[in-house]
């Protein structure tokens, strides 16, 4: 699990989006960003999570929060995910797991007694100066957007 904590500077990264355009975290300096890591596009939990963000994106935007979803999927799979689910925010491909390792969300997991390596579903709210404001983990996919919006609503706007 991540060793990052609120107050730490968010690790810098450059990743391709679903149409192979390079996106840098530094492109968002001056804006708040929700960087959320998810295991695999088009799977049930990840689809629920992404569609709930899609359906509530205006609420995130009203809090001046941009959304970036990151997974180990290739750009073609991300494009399919975006098109099939009509996603209205940016998905990034971390095929080599370099960024997920920088954020400390890639590691050994156990499912039904089998060990494997994968993404720990984790979200980082990064402030407009590039520092981690809040880390969200151990949540149900269907509640992800509610937890983050509740947190955003509890803060004074900046």
Swiss-Prot record:
InterPro entries per the UniProt record, alphabetical: AhpC/TSA, Peroxiredoxin_BCP/PrxQ, Thioredoxin-like_sf, Thioredoxin_domain
Enzyme Commission number(s) of this protein: 1.11.1.24
Enzyme class, spelled out: oxidoreductase
Gene3D superfamilies in UniProt: Glutaredoxin
A GO biological process held by the record: cellular response to oxidative stress
Cellular compartments per GO CC: cytoplasm
Signal peptide: none
Residue ranges constituting the Thioredoxin domain according to the UniProt record: 4-157
Keywords of this entry: Antioxidant, Disulfide bond, Oxidoreductase, Peroxidase, Redox-active center
Disulphides: 46-51
Catalytic activity: a hydroperoxide + [thioredoxin]-dithiol = an alcohol + [thioredoxin]-disulfide + H2O
Catalytic residues (positions): 46
GO molecular function: thioredoxin peroxidase activity
Pfam families: AhpC-TSA
Other information: The active site is a conserved redox-active cysteine residue, the peroxidatic cysteine (C(P)), which makes the nucleophilic attack on the peroxide substrate. The peroxide oxidizes the C(P)-SH to cysteine sulfenic acid (C(P)-SOH), which then reacts with another cysteine residue, the resolving cysteine (C(R)), to form a disulfide bridge. The disulfide is subsequently reduced by an appropriate electron donor to complete the catalytic cycle. In this atypical 2-Cys peroxiredoxin, C(R) is present in the same subunit to form an intramolecular disulfide.
Oligomer status and interactors: Monomer.
Function noted in UniProt: Thiol-specific peroxidase that catalyzes the reduction of hydrogen peroxide and organic hydroperoxides to water and alcohols, respectively. Plays a role in cell protection against oxidative stress by detoxifying peroxides and as sensor of hydrogen peroxide-mediated signaling events.
Family to which the UniProt record says this protein belongs: Belongs to the peroxiredoxin family. BCP/PrxQ subfamily.
Protein name in UniProt: Putative peroxiredoxin bcp
Source organism: Buchnera aphidicola subsp. Schizaphis graminum (strain Sg)
């Amino acid at each position: 699990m991540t060793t990052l904590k609120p107050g730490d500077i968010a690790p810098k990264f450059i990743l391709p989006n679903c149409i192979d355009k390079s996106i840098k975290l530094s492109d968002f300096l001056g804006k708040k960003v929700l960087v959320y890591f998810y295991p695999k596009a088009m799977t049930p939990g990840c689809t629920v999570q992404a569609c709930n963000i899609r359906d509530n994106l205006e609420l995130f935007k009203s809090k001046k929060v941009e959304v970036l979803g990151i997974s180990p999927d290739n750009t073609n799979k991300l494009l399919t995910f975006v098109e099939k689910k009509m996603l209205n925010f940016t998905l990034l491909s971390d095929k080599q797991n370099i960024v997920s390792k920088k954020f400390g969300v890639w590691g050994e997991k156990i499912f039904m007694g089998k060990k494997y390596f994968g993404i720990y579903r984790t979200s980082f709210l990064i402030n407009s100066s590039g520092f981690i404001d809040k880390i969200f983990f151990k949540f149900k996919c269907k509640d992800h957007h509610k937890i983050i919006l509740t947190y955003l609503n509890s803060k004074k706007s900046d």
